[in-house]
Structures are given as structure tokens and as C-alpha cells.
Amino acid sequence: EVDIGAKPAQGGARRVMPDPRSPVGEALMQIQKRDRGFDPNRFLDGAEAAFGMIVEAFARGDRATLKPLLSDEAYAGFDQAIAAREAAGETQRTELRSVEESGIEAAELRGNIAEVTVRLVTDQINLVQARDGSIVSGAEAVTEMTDVWTFQRDVTSSDPSWKLVGSTSA
């Protein structure tokens, strides 16, 4: 669930918004016509906040936090990755230091279902450690990461929450 009125997890991110005359800009206007509460800037605030909650909950293996934020299909993928990490005796540490840039890359309205894809450039520490504490992957250093996440919402629903339906690292 992403409250589009939420404040950004980290202030000061550079915003990249589509030209209103572009296909993405036109799709955002179609979403706004069907969902009067939709505002692209507030949506990005919520997406940034959700990103922080989701990556940190994933690192902790906090399934209870993840479940309401993700579609069933996305949750199944995250759950499988957490289970594999647990089975291997590994732990993940993720510290989101800042959101440097966020932008809307794609938008679509299919029937009552709105989908908005965002690109997030963040600075984070991300590492996986074995039982003995040795680093399996990642590093203690702050690394710039780029992620592309797609959120979805039924615009006829009284629930203003958006769910993560897809994620990739760019």
C-alpha cells in the first residue's frame, strides 16, 4: 500500500517528470481524470517512501511489512528470495542513505487499472553476509543504485493505496 499523500523518505530528490504532451504525460492525465486524488508529484513522494519501506523490510526478511505493499505475484518473488537467503544462513543489510532522483518513466490506464512506472536513483549500503559474517555480495561502501518499479491501483477503489507489481534493477 502506497499512500500517495505520504512524505518522501528522503527529502531533496531531483524529480524527472514527463512532458504533459508526451504519451506518458497524456496517460498521467487520463489517470487524473479517473482518479481526482492522483497527483504525479505526490505519487512520487509515496513511491520514494514505499521504496525505503520495501527494501529495508526485504533486507530484514519482514514478510508482514511486505505483504500489504506488494501484489500477490510480487510478494511471492520477494518471499522466495527471503526463504533462499534464510536457508543459506545469510543475512542482508540495506541502508537507504538518500533518494537522489525519482521520475515517472511510464504510465498506463487499462480499464480501471492504473499502472505507473518510476525510476529511482538511490545511494545505499547493500550487502549480504554469510553465517560467519563474511560478505557474500555487496559492500560496506555507499553505492549508487538504479531501480525501476511499477505500481498499480484500481482507480475505482476507495483505497488510495498503490501496490508494487514489478521491480528491476537498471
Question: What does each model-identified segment do?
Answer:
Residues E56, R63-A170:
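Structured, amphipathic secondary-structure segments that form assembly/contact surfaces
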